[in-house]
Amino acid sequence: MTQASSQRAVYWGTGRRKTAVARVRLVPGTGKIIINDRPGDQYLQYQEALLASVKGPLEILGLENSYDILVRAHGGGVHGQADAIKLGVARALCEVDPANRGPLKVEGYLKRDPRAVERKKYGLRKARKAPQYSKR
């Protein structure tokens, strides 16, 4: 047995938000973020807030320059995908070391946001908007 077999090199985490799904791989590295084969800042349209939210779980644990983040994301929009990636990174960090779970849970990084678009109902114009009521 080699040392590599006892210490895994790749950690997986899945995150979801609205209709976005992100499969996140954490690989020991220098802190690069690659989303769908593109640099993270380019994929997230150079929005610093989104990049910061993706890096959030790593920064809480002081590991921002210890792992490369490799992501396959689909569905939803840029914001939904960024939140899905954030959850996936947090779940992967829990795989790295179960002791990471406590600080991530306190900061709320392990919560899956359940809000999604409500379906349209028949007889209504939208999910809750009804046609104008006429008494006579």
Curated annotation (Swiss-Prot):
Single GO biological process annotation from the record: translation
InterPro entries: Ribosomal_Su5_D2-typ_SF, Ribosomal_uS9, Ribosomal_uS9_bac/plastid, Ribosomal_uS9_CS, Ribsml_uS5_D2-typ_fold_subgr
Statement: the UniProt record of this protein carries the keyword Transmembrane helix: no
Keyword Ribonucleoprotein: yes
An MF annotation (GO) of this entry: RNA binding
Example of a GO cellular component annotation carried by this entry: small ribosomal subunit
One Pfam assignment: Ribosomal_S9
Superkingdom to which the source organism belongs: Bacteria
Record-linked PROSITE patterns: RIBOSOMAL_S9 (PS00360)
UniProt keyword annotations, A-Z: Ribonucleoprotein, Ribosomal protein
PANTHER family reported in the protein's UniProt record: RIBOSOMAL PROTEIN S9, SMALL RIBOSOMAL SUBUNIT PROTEIN US9M
Membership in a protein family: Belongs to the universal ribosomal protein uS9 family.
Protein name in the entry: Small ribosomal subunit protein uS9
Species this chain originates from: Synechococcus sp. (strain JA-2-3B'a(2-13))
Lineage: Bacteria, Bacillati, Cyanobacteriota, Cyanophyceae, Synechococcales
Gene: rpsI
